[in-house]
From Swiss-Prot:
EC nos: 2.7.1.148
Pathway noted in the entry: Isoprenoid biosynthesis; isopentenyl diphosphate biosynthesis via DXP pathway; isopentenyl diphosphate from 1-deoxy-D-xylulose 5-phosphate: step 3/6
UniProt-listed NCBIfam families: ispE, PRK14608.1
GO biological process terms, semicolon-separated: isopentenyl diphosphate biosynthetic process, methylerythritol 4-phosphate pathway; terpenoid biosynthetic process
Catalytic residue positions: 10, 136
Domain of life of the source: Bacteria
UniProt name for this protein: 4-diphosphocytidyl-2-C-methyl-D-erythritol kinase
HAMAP family, per the entry: IspE
Positions that bind ATP: 94-104
Gene designation: ispE
Organism: Bacillus cereus (strain AH187)
The keyword Transferase belongs to this UniProt entry's keyword annotation: yes
GO molecular function: 4-(cytidine 5'-diphospho)-2-C-methyl-D-erythritol kinase activity; ATP binding
Function comment: Catalyzes the phosphorylation of the position 2 hydroxy group of 4-diphosphocytidyl-2C-methyl-D-erythritol.
Amino acid sequence: MKLLVKAPAKINLSLDVLGKRQDGYHEVKMIMTTIDLADRLELMELAEDRIEILSHNRYVPDDQRNLAYQAAKLLKEKFNVKKGVSITIEKTIPVAAGLAGGSSDAAATLRGLNKLWNLGLTIDQLAELGAEIGSDVSFCVYGGTAIATGRGEQIEHIKTPPSCWVILAKPHIGVSTADVYGNLKLNRVTHPNVDKMVDVINAGDYKGICDTVGNVLEDVTFAMHPEVARIKAQMKRFGADAVLMSGSGPTVFGLVHHDSRMHRIYNGLKGFCEQVYAVRLLGERETLE
């Protein structure tokens, strides 16, 4: 038996870091929403007791460094599953881009194997298991639009923002999340107003959302990688309604309401950035079939 599962990317509309925790993680407060850029996973049951990861993308690890592998291993161990699984990952989300591609693959694996192996877990139980794999996995299990607190695993759902275009541009560099957090000086950065963002989203106020986007990690990543700041400036110059870096970078996204402007910005960015995408904001929650 085999199953196809979608794994959508996320962007942060607001991301704040409140401090460092005793467990070494950082306390965060952020708003994430899913977008219509997704990896596709094919899960195929194996008679042998093993986990196999397949992908044409050479940047996707095929061992336990892969979060989808970790998700399958976790379910096998927790629920004493003796069957195996082959997971084929068709990557569309750029790797190491600040878009939670790996976390979303893990979340899709949890949802898919729950069905394939007839585990009968609720979406809340899957999200709880996701937190054992990575900070963004819980959110990715649910999808939709939510405030994430703690280290990112405590999820509170809010309304879906008004529909718009999301233009993504990823420079050809990698950003180490650990280095970004390591260089973060909380008293020297601009903290976004996360609570105000919740209010404007719940009010369906598109202009308010555009005026309130913010990411406390931007200044740090910009100092380490000035080309990310240049992409943000260029996207603003082309006329996006709001521009922000997602996660710890290096991907920058712009929100755009009008189709004609979206095409202009997309074509303009293609001139000097290798990976550019124009997708819709999804913001809808996942359901278990």
